[in-house]
Amino acid sequence: MSAKADERSQAVLRRVAEYVKALGEYDAHFSVVAGDYTTQGRYSVAGDAYHIVVDQAEVYSDGKTRYEVDHDRKEVNIDEMDVNNRNIMDNPTRCFDFVGDEYASMVWTELGENITLLLRANDTVLEGDIYLTVNRNNGRPNRIVYVLYEDRIEVDITSLERRKGAMPKFEVSKYREYEIVDFR
C-alpha cells in the first residue's frame, strides 16, 4: 500500500465518519446476501445504543448489554456487548468507524460517484477483508462486504436517514412467554 493511496483512503474514511456523525441518531434499511441466503432488514442507532430487525429476529443494545430476540424460537439471549466489533449485523454503532490506525486501508475501485475501499485489520487476530463502498461526493456509505476465506456477506444500505422517533429499547415485560438465557 502506498502512502498516497493510504492518505486518500483515510480522507474517504473521515468523510464517511463525518457523514454518519452529522446524522446523529439514524435509521438504516439494508439488504443482505450471504451465499444462498438473501434478506432485508433495518437498524436504528442512537449513540452506543441500537436496534436491529432481520426476519424473525431483533437485537437490542444499550451499548453495554446485547439482547438477541428470536421470535420463532421464543428465546432471548442476553450477553455483554462487544463495543469493538465493527460488523454491521453485530454492532451497527461502529460499522462505518474505520478512521485511525486499527485498519489499513486502500482505494480498491472507483466507478462513477462510488469509491470502494479495502480495509484490513492491523491486528492479525482479526482475519478477513472488508470492502466499503461510499459515495465519493458526500461520504454516504452504500455497501459493505465482509470476506473471510470462502465466506462473503454483502450488505447494501438502501436508506440512511436521521431518526425521527424514539429509539426502541428492550423491555423484558414484552417477552414473559420467552425463554431467557443470560450469558453475562
Please describe what each predicted stretch is.
Residues 40-42, 57-58, 107, 129-133:
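Short, surface-exposed charged micro-motifs
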Residues 43-51, 60-66, 111-113, 134-141, ...:
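Short, solvent-exposed coil/turn segments at beta-strand boundaries
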Residues 2-6, 111-115, 121-129, 136-184:
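Non-transmembrane domains of secretory- and envelope-associated proteins
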